[in-house]
Amino acid sequence: MEKKYILALDQGTTSSRAMIIDEEGEVIGVAQEEFDQIFPKPGWVEHNANEIWASILAVIAGVLLKTNISSKEIAGIGITNQRETTVIWDKESGNPIYNAIVWQSRQTEDICKQLRKDGYEDTIRSKTGLLIDPYFAGTKARWILDHVDGAQERAEKGELLFGTIDTWLVWKLTGGRAHITDYSNASRTLLYNIYDLEWDDELLKMLNIPKAMLPEVRPSSEVYADTVPYHFFGEEVPVAGIAGDQQAALFGQGCFEKGMAKNTYGTGCFLLMNTGEKAVRSENGLLTTLAWGIDGKVEYALEGSIFVAGSAIQWLRDGLRMVRQSSDSENYASRIESSDGVYVVPAFVGLGAPYWDSDVRGAVFGLTRGTEKEQFIRATLESLAYQTRDVLYAMEQDSGISLKTLRVDGGASANNFLMQFQSDILGVPVERPENKETTVLGAAFLAGLAVGVWKDKNEIKKHWKLDKRFEVEMKDEQREDLYEGWHKAVKAAQAFK
């Protein structure tokens, strides 16, 4: 039986998905399963790692049954994952010693405060490209070792293993034969030196993380190990590609050249720009991260995250009940010529890059007696585009590269009003692909390269198909006036703390 399909596993924050991709890069079938969110205290978010694993087994079985494709026809497995979420488990039993601590969780704030107090910010920045923040995996591992009896001692003896979700899934799929991660995920731990490409002894000492528990770091596209037959309908299938979700989306968007960038409009926005084989240190509060490692070399990216994007549209729907469904926001926004001076600063959980202000809160400016819900909805959508421009401007400043086009994906990229305004406020065209499942595609392409389904990046590029290109329609003067108004609104919101 010909092995011509790739199985891509997308382990996300609220659900796990499995997709089967054919040689043309088309999605043949998909299965999805949600799992529970655990909130032990305000600001804490955890997952049951065994439940995540069960959801992965369920979606693998589900997608094979749904498509009537045999496990014998699967050439390889690619994995993409929610980044930074951390699991520590017992090497012998395979049981986690505590829940997985999720990327959103703020429970390690005290550890971060201590690191800042001890003066580690510059060291961390210069070695990892990251900021000290509870977002990243290293402090989560430290928290688990601190809060589970005997964990530190057991970790030092080599009895416990640490991993982000990719590592956990590969370990389970291969029956414990492979304890690995890839460059993209390792670069999100606060423990990995992105220049020397190794776990950094000084950083490990700083957080007192025993080296014995860390996974081996491997390229993003490589045959790592085979699945154990009992997890895969009697087949040993190569696990052959891994990338964190945002890097996978950059790859799935075909952003292979230096200076190419993508924005994923999900709950938040994640912007990544490929900076090639050179790591660009940011002077503007962006993260420097590993994009992927392929063909014996690594490539880097600049990353900026916007905390509130799609969730602002959900707020219009669920909080304010201004729209029945998220897609209605496009119709309301398009009915009027402008927002009439209304600005929404959706800083519900602070502002991310390039402001990094966790104390600022949401605000609305410019309301008059004539303001109606159309202006309010339009201004909320526009805020996503303004924040994207903030980040892209910072990327251009840091990298010295002028953006020529922006590729987009994620739920809100389906909103034509938003995409047109995005193009207008950036002053560059915006390209939306036919297949918006770019994260899953990225994982599939990485695995397919390793097992020979695709020859090289050039062949993969041909599978990127344009759905719509949004050309710039706004005049320069209007663009700058609107953007200046946005900056005034942000400053005013920051002053209100």
Curated annotation (Swiss-Prot):
Q: Name one GO biological process term.
A: glycerol metabolic process
- What gene is behind this protein? glpK
The name on file for this protein is Glycerol kinase
- Single GO molecular function: ATP binding
Task: Spell out the family assignment given in the record's similarity comment.
Answer: Belongs to the FGGY kinase family.
Q: Which CDD domains match?
A: FGGY_EcGK_like (cd07786)
Enumerate the residues binding ADP: 13, 17, 267, 310, 411, 415
GO cellular-component terms in the record?
cytosol
Which function does this protein serve? Answer: Key enzyme in the regulation of glycerol uptake and metabolism. Catalyzes the phosphorylation of glycerol to yield sn-glycerol 3-phosphate.
Record's keyword terms, sorted: ATP-binding, Glycerol metabolism, Kinase, Nucleotide-binding, Phosphoprotein, Transferase
